[in-house]
Amino acid sequence: MVQLAKVPILGNDIIHVGYNIHDHLVETIIKHCPSSTYVICNDTNLSKVPYYQQLVLEFKASLPEGSRLLTYVVKPGETSKSRETKAQLEDYLLVEGCTRDTVMVAIGGGVIGDMIGFVASTFMRGVRVVQVPTSLLAMVDSSIGGKTAIDTPLGKNFIGAFWQPKFVLVDIKWLETLAKREFINGMAEVIKTACIWNADEFTRLESNASLFLNVVNGEKNVKVTNQLTNEIDEISNTDIEAMLDHTYKLVLESIKVKAEVVSSDERESSLRNLLNFGHSIGHAYEAILTPQALHGECVSIGMVKEAELSRYFGILSPTQVARLSKILVAYGLPVSPDEKWFKELTLHKKTPLDILLKKMSIDKKNEGSKKKVVILESIGKCYGDSAQFVSDEDLRFILTDETLVYPFKDIPADQQKVVIPPGSKSISNRALILAALGEGQCKIKNLLHSDDTKHMLTAVHELKGATISWEDNGETVVVEGHGGSTLSACADPLYLGNAGTASRFLTSLAALVNSTPSQKYIVLTGNARMQQRPIAPLVDSLRANGTKIEYLNNEGSLPIKVYTDSVFKGGRIELAATVSSQYVSSILMCAPYAEEPVTLALVGGKPISKLYVDMTIKMMEKFGINVETSTTEPYTYYIPKGHYINPSEYVIESDASSATYPLAFAAMTGTTVTVPNIGFESLQGDARFARDVLKPMGCKITQTATSTTVSGPPVGTLKPLKHVDMEPMTDAFLTACVVAAISHDSDPNSANTTTIEGIANQRVKECNRILAMATELAKFGVKTTELPDGIQVHGLNSIKDLKVPSDSSGPVGVCTYDDHRVAMSFSLLAGMVNSQNERDEVANPVRILERHCTGKTWPGWWDVLHSELGAKLDGAEPLECTSKKNSKKSVVIIGMRAAGKTTISKWCASALGYKLVDLDELFEQQHNNQSVKQFVVENGWEKFREEETRIFKEVIQNYGDDGYVFSTGGGIVESAESRKALKDFASSGGYVLHLHRDIEETIVFLQSDPSRPAYVEEIREVWNRREGWYKECSNFSFFAPHCSAEAEFQALRRSFSKYIATITGVREIEIPSGRSAFVCLTFDDLTEQTENLTPICYGCEAVEVRVDHLANYSADFVSKQLSILRKATDSIPIIFTVRTMKQGGNFLDEEFKTLRELYDIALKNGVEFLDLELTLPTDIQYEVINKRGNTKIIGSHHDFQGLYSWDDAEWENRFNQALTLDVDVVKFVGTAVNFEDNLRLEHFRDTHKNKPLIAVNMTSKGSISRVLNNVLTPVTSDLLPNSAAPGQLTVAQINKMYTSMGGIEPKELFVVGKPIGHSRSPILHNTGYEILGLPHKFDKFETGSAQLVKEKLLDGNKNFGGAAVTIPLKLDIMQYMDELTDAAKVIGAVNTVIPLGNKKFKGDNTDWLGIRNALINNGVPEYVGHTAGLVIGAGGTSRAALYALHSLGCKKIFIINRTTSKLKPLIESLPSEFNIIGIESTKSIEEIKEHVGVAVSCVPADKPLDDELLSKLERFLVKGAHAAFVPTLLEAAYKPSVTPVMTISQDKYQWHVVPGSQMLVHQGVAQFEKWTGFKGPFKAIFDAVTKE
C-alpha cells in the first residue's frame, strides 16, 4: 500500500494524496474546518458509486454535536456548470439557512470542482471549500490552484474567481470507477507536467505505459447495490491496485509540479502560464471538436504541435519530439487530428486553418493581437520562464500538411552552414535487428527517430526480441539482446506503415520467432502503398527453405502470415536480388540462427545496390559474425552458425541519402554546406553523391574520411551531367534530378540533358519514383525522358524559366506520393522558382503537398531548411485537388443480368445530368464491334474478364470524377481485380450502386434472353456466388421490382430519381422546422398494404418502418419493403427503426451482428432517417454515425417502465450523449405516470433547444405531450392494425386537441374572382381540412373588384387565412400585396394571397408548381437538362408554363402560338436565361436538333386547333421519340377532361398526356401547404375534386 503524502502549496500542506483514505478525509475536514453546516456537492453519476455512499454515511456518523450534513446533487456534464445551476444551489443554501461558517465539499470532476468553488467564493462573500477530486484530470489540474468558474453561452470559464480551497484531498481509489476514456484523457495533463518540469518522471512514465494501458483496457461494468437507496446501479470498474504504485506516483508527481508553479505565480502573471503547454493549440482544436473530443485529447495534439513548433525554431531536438509523440501514443492519446480512430471519434469534423488561428487569438496568454505559445527546450524544461510570441506564418506551417516554399531570395552567397542529418535509416534498422538478435547490452547512438524505426522498435518489443530502454534524455537507445531465444509470436498484427526496410527485415526475423501455447503465427501488414510493394522474391526463398508463409491479400505483397511452428533450415538458399538488396540483407542477418550454416546464392543477374549488402556484412562483423564471400561462385556468401555478441556501444552514421539535400541546396544556391560526419570512409553508397554527381556539375567538393563540404557555383551556372550510373546510390537520383533541372551548358546540341541510369529499383520504392519525378518536374516546365533503368532530365536554358506549378484554374501543388525523398527533393527546386527575380517583385510560392511524409527519414527536414538554411516557409489550407475541384463523382451500376441496369442507368444519367456509358458497348467498340458473346466463344471467359477489368479501371481512372454513369456487365464482380477496383472507387467517395430484384423474376427473364452468352452454370448458382460480392463491392443498393404496367414503371422511375438525388446529395434531406409528424407503421409485410400506405401517411412529413415488426430480416426482404413503401408513397422520407426489446420493441437485445447488417441495408438504401438507440454499444453507434452519408440520424431513448422522471439525470446524460454523437435529431420517449410528468417534460423541452428534439410521454396521461411536441411527432393511423406505442394519436386527433388549446386558430379562406360558381377550390381545401382535423373553412367570395377583396377580406376579416385568386383579379390584386415572390413577379400574376400578420400580405403564384408537380408525378424527371421543352399558346398560363419548364432544367424552351406576333413581347418580358425560342415558321422546326420531351398546352380547350398551329405542334411531337424519358404533355385546361391536343399527342404520337385536373389539384395542394404548413392529402383531394 502507498503512504499518505502531503504537498505544500502557497506555504500550506493542504494537498493530501493517498489511497483509500476516506477516514482521513472525514477526520481532516471535521477537525480542521469546524462548522455548523457541511454541504457535500456532487453529480448524480457519483451518487451511484459505493465508495461515495460509504463516505457520506461515515461523514454523518462522525459529525460533532451541533453540526449537520447536507447533500446537493446536480446533473452531470458541462451543462451543469452554468449560472442557472449556481443560482439553484445558492437558493438551496439560503433556504436551508446556511451561514458564513458553511463548508462546501466538492466531490467530483472538474465541472463540480470549478462550479462549487465559484459558489463558495461568492456565497456570503466567501465560504470555505474543500476539493475532493474524483477524476484524474481534476486530481492533477483543476482542483489545484484555486481557479473557479462557470460557463456562459459565449464561452467556457468566462465568469469565475481565484478562491483557494482549504484542502485538496486526493484519494486514488476514486479512479477505480473512472471510465477508460476519461482516465486516458487525464493522462494528457500528467504527461504535460512531466514534460515541462520533471524529466525523471517523464522517463518513469515511459517505462510504465504498457502496464497502464493493460489495466485501463481491462475496465469492466459491474452492478452494485446503492447503500443509500437500495437501487441496483451499473458502474465501471478498473483494477487500480494492479498499477497502484504507478498511479499514485503519476498523480503525486504531477500535483507537485502544479503546486510548485502555482506557489510561485498564484495569479498567472508569468510562470504559471507554462502549465498551458499544449493548450494554445489544443484549446483551438477543442473549440472545434467539442463535445466529441475531450480536453486531454486535444491538449495531447496541441503538445505535439507546439513541440514541433519548438523544433521548427531549432530549439527542441527531433529526438525529444519523437519521445513526446511516442509516450502520448503509448498512453492511448491522439497525436494528430488526422489519426483514423480520432477522426471517427470526432465524426470527421474539419479543422480549418483560419478557424484554428481565430480560436488561438482568444487566449489569456496573448498580448493584444500577438499570440503566445509555451516553447519546450527539452523534456523536463521550457524555453524561458513564460510563453513566447509566435507569428501566424509559423503557426500556419505547423498546423497544416501543405507547405508554401518561397523563393530562396535572401540567402547570402557567402553563407556557410554545418548540417548534421539524422542517423541512417538503413544502418538504424540493421542495428536494431542485430542488437535484438545479439546477446548483451548495446547502447545505440544517433539512431534515426522516424516512422520507420518507430515501427521496427515496436515490432522488436512486441516479439519480445529484446528489452528496450532510453538514456541521455532519449538520445540513446539501450537494447538488451537475448540472443534470439525469447522471440515469441504476438497476437496482434505488426503494422509497419509504409516502412519497406522494416517489412523486409522482419519477414526473415519472423522465421526465427517461437510459437506460444496460444499463438502459432504472426502477421505483418502495412498501409495501402505498403500492400502494393513487392516482397515475393524474399518470401519465395524463405518458403523454399522451410518457412510456411501465406499472403493474406495481394499475391507478392504484405499483409503476410508467417507460421512460427515452421523452421528456418539453412543450407543453400537461392534468392533473386535484382529488385531489392534488402532481401539479401534480411536473410544475411538472420542466417546465423538457422539450423544449418547458410550458403546464400544471389541468382537472376547482377544484384541491385551491392554496396548495401557490403554494409550489412561489415555491420555483422561488428556484432561478431564473419561472412565469407565465395571465390568460386559469383554473388554467393557463406554464413556460419552462431550468435551475435553485442558491442557495448554502436554509433549510427548520419544518413548519406538525407545528406544529399543540404549538399544539393549548397549546389543550387551557390552557398556552402558541410556535413561533418559522412566522408569517403562511409559504409553508405550515397556518400559519393557529392564527388560523383555534384563535382562534375560544377561544385567545389572537399571530402575527408569523415566529412563532406560542397560549395556551389554562382546561381544558374550548374552544368548537366552527360551520364552517371547511380546504381551504388539509387536513393540519391531524385536529388540529382532537381539539380539537373536547373543545369545548362553552352552546347546547343546537348539539350542540357543529364542522363541517370542504374536505378530500376526506384520504380518499386514508396512509389514509382522515376514516374513521380517525371510527372512533377513537368509541372515546373522541365522535360524528361524515361529510360528502361533510369531517366533523362532536360535542364532549362535559364533558371528564370522555372514555372510555378499551375493549371487553367490556378496554382496546383507538387504531389509527394507519400514519399519522403520526393518531398525533400522538390522542396529544393521549389525555392529556386523566381529566386532570380528582382528583390521587390512579388513572387508566388510553390505548394508542396503532404510535407509530413519526410518524417520517414528526416522529421526535422523542414526545420533545417527554414531555421538553418534560411528558407522562408508558410503553411496553407489544403487546396482541393484540381481534379476534385468541380468533382462530380461518377456512378457505377452493378448487378445481375436482367436487374434493370440498362434502363435504370438511363434514368440515373437523366436525373443527375450525367453522361451514360454502357461498358459492354464500350467493350464492343474497342474490339472492332465484336459482340461479347462472339468474343467469349473465341477467347474464353477468363480473357473477357481481363479485358472487362482493364476497361473498367481505365474509365474510373479517367472519368471517375467527371459525372458519368457506368453500366457494367453482370459478371464484373467475378474478377478479384475488378472487385478491388470497385471497392477502391467506393472508398474514394464514388457511388457503386448494386441494383437487384427478386431472383425468381430474374431467372424467368434470363432463361428467355438469347442476346447474351449462355451461363455455363445454373442462374441460381451464379447468384449465390455473386450475391456476397455485389454487397461487398457496393456502397449503395436499390431494389427494382418487376413492373407490369406503365403507371408502376413511372412510379419506380420517380422513386429511383429521388433515391439517386438523395444519396448523391442533390436532394437535401430537410429536418422540418415547424410542427410536423411521422406515422409509425406496424405491419409485418407491406406487400398487401400498398393501397393503404398513401392515406396512412396523410399529413406526415415522414413514415417510420418498424423493421423489428417485419416478418424477416433478410437483406432482400427488407430492401423490398423499402422499395414498396417508396413507390406507394411517392418517396415520402423514411425513418428506419430497429427497436430492441429493452427499448420497447421486438428485436432481440444482443443480436448485434444482425443489427449491424440491418443498419448497413438502411444506409445502402439511402433512407432519409435512421433511428439509433442511445443504449446500443458505442462501437455500433460510431460505425453508423461515420457511415451515415446523407442520412440523418435520430438518437433515441425510451423509458417504457417509467423509471425516470423528466428531471432525472438519465435524460440529461442521454442528451449529452446525443450531442457527443452529433445526431441530427434527439428522440426521447418517457412514460406519464401522472399529469405533472407532462409539465416536467415541457420544462426539459424548453431548456434543450440546441438540437431538434422529439419528446413525448406514453400512455393516455401523456397525450398532451404529443400535442405540444413540435418536430416529427410520432403518430398512428386508423388504417393501422395497432399503434406502435401506448397513447399514440392520429394527425387529426392531435390537430383537434391543439385547436381546442388555442394552438391553431380557425381561419377563413376564400376563392375570389368572377365567375366562380363552378370553382372546385372549396371542395379541394375543405376535404384536406377534414382529413387532417384542421379547424379552417374555405368558401367562395365572388367579385370582380380587387378593391372589394381588400376592404372585406384583407382589411375587414380578422380571421382571414388566405385567398385563391382567379380571373379577373390575378393582376388587379397585386397592388395590395406588400411582398411578391419571385414566381409572382416573373409570371406577372398572383393566384395566392398569404397573410404575413400585421395586415401585411404576400402575393404568390402556384400555377407553375401545379404544372411542374403534375409533370413530375407522371414520370418526368425533376431535372431534364438534356431535353428541350415546348409551350403551346401565349396567354396568361403560358408564363407559368415557361417558369415551370425552366425550373425543370430545360436547356431550351420552344413556344408556338396561333398569333405569332404575340411571341416576341412575351419572350422579351421574361428572363433571358429561360432561353425561350419563338417559332414563327413550320420550316424552322425541321432545323431543330434538340429532342423535345415535355410540353404544356395553354390554348383554349373548347375550340379546334388552327391548322398552322396544328402543323407546328405535330412537327414538335415527332421530336419526342428520342427523349430520355416517355415524352409527356400537360393540358392546362381542366375542362373538358380530354382535349384535342391531348388526343393527337397520345393517339398519333404516343406521348403520355396529363389532364388539367391534375394541374388544378397540384396547384391547390401547393396553396394548401403554404397556408396551413401541412402537405395536402393529394389522392383524397383529387378524388373529391374529380368525382363529379
From Swiss-Prot:
Its EC number is 4.2.3.4, 2.5.1.19, 2.7.1.71, 4.2.1.10. 7-phospho-2-dehydro-3-deoxy-D-arabino-heptonate binds at residues 125, 141, 147, 157, 189-192, 258, 272-276, 279, 295, 364. The keyword Coiled coil does not apply. It is found in: Cytoplasm. Keywords: Amino-acid biosynthesis, Aromatic amino acid biosynthesis, ATP-binding, Cytoplasm, Kinase, Lyase, Metal-binding, Multifunctional enzyme, NADP, Nucleotide-binding, Oxidoreductase, Transferase, Zinc. ATP binds at G895, M896, R897, A898, A899, G900, K901, T902. Residues 405-871 are annotated as: EPSP synthase. GO terms for molecular function: 3-dehydroquinate dehydratase activity; 3-dehydroquinate synthase activity; 3-phosphoshikimate 1-carboxyvinyltransferase activity; ATP binding; metal ion binding; shikimate 3-dehydrogenase (NADP+) activity; shikimate kinase activity. Its main location: cytoplasm. NAD(+) binds at residues 43-45, 78-81, 109-111, 114, 134-135, 156, 174-177, 185. One of its GO terms (biological process) is aromatic amino acid family biosynthetic process. Residues 890-1080 are annotated as: Shikimate kinase. GO terms for cellular component: cytoplasm. Residues 1-392 are annotated as: 3-dehydroquinate synthase. Its cofactor is Zn(2+). Residues 1306-1588 are annotated as: Shikimate dehydrogenase. Homodimer. The AROM polypeptide catalyzes 5 consecutive enzymatic reactions in prechorismate polyaromatic amino acid biosynthesis. This is Pentafunctional AROM polypeptide. The gene is ARO1.
